Curated annotation (Swiss-Prot):
<dbReference type="InterPro" id="IPR029069">
    <property type="entry name" value="HotDog_dom_sf"/>
</dbReference>
<comment type="function">
    <text>Is not required for competence.</text>
</comment>
<dbReference type="InterPro" id="IPR006683">
    <property type="entry name" value="Thioestr_dom"/>
</dbReference>
<dbReference type="GO" id="GO:0061522">
    <property type="term" value="F:1,4-dihydroxy-2-naphthoyl-CoA thioesterase activity"/>
</dbReference>
<protein>
    <recommendedName>
        <fullName>Putative esterase ComA2</fullName>
        <ecNumber>3.1.2.-</ecNumber>
    </recommendedName>
</protein>
<dbReference type="InterPro" id="IPR003736">
    <property type="entry name" value="PAAI_dom"/>
</dbReference>
<dbReference type="Pfam" id="PF03061">
    <property type="entry name" value="4HBT"/>
</dbReference>
<comment type="similarity">
    <text>Belongs to the thioesterase PaaI family.</text>
</comment>
<dbReference type="GO" id="GO:0005829">
    <property type="term" value="C:cytosol"/>
</dbReference>
<keyword id="KW-0378">Hydrolase</keyword>
Length: 126
C-alpha cells in the first residue's frame, strides 16, 4: 500500500508490526505532531490510534470484496509527552461480520501509558 501523500506520511507514522492479533505503529513527537505549547497533540494521538486499528483490520477482511472504514473513535489522554517517539499497540476485542472493534494503548519511550483509545471500524462491501 502506497503511503505517499497520506496523513501517515505527513505525521511520520510507521507500521512496525502487523498481524491478525495486533498492530504496532510508531510516531515521532516533533514539529508535525505537537500543539503550540510543545506537547503531543491529542489529535495526533487519535490519528495514530486509528491508523493502528485500521492497519490491523486489514488482516481480518477479504480484500477482494471488503474494506474497513472508521466508524467511531474515542481517546483518553493520560500523560503528556514533549519529545521522542510514541508507540501504539492495537488489539482487536470484537471481530464481527459488519464491525471490528480495537483497543489501542499508546506508550511513550519509557513504556508509560499516555493514551487509551477504542476504535470501531465498519466492514463495508467494495
Amino acid at each position: 500500500m502506497d503511503m505517499k501523500h497520506t496523513l501517515l506520511e505527513a505525521l511520520g507514522i510507521e507500521i512496525v508490526e502487523n498481524t491478525a492479533e495486533r498492530c504496532v505503529a510508531v510516531m515521532p513527537v516533533d514539529h508535525r505532531t505537537v500543539q503550540p505549547f510543545g506537547y503531543l497533540h491529542g489529535g495526533a494521538s487519535v490519528a495514530l490510534a486509528e491508523t493502528a486499528a485500521s492497519a490491523g483490520a486489514q488482516n481480518l477482511i477479504d480484500h477482494t470484496t471488503q474494506a474497513c472504514v472508521g466508524l467511531e473513535i474515542n481517546a483518553n489522554h493520560l500523560k503528556s509527552v514533549k519529545e521522542g517517539t510514541v508507540k501504539a499497540i492495537a488489539e482487536p476485542v470484537h471481530i464481527g461480520r459488519t464491525t471490528i472493534v480495537y483497543h489501542i494503548h499508546i506508550y511513550d519511550e519509557q513504556e508509560r501509558l499516555i493514551c487509551i483509545s477504542r476504535c470501531t471500524l465498519a466492514v463495508i462491501k467494495k
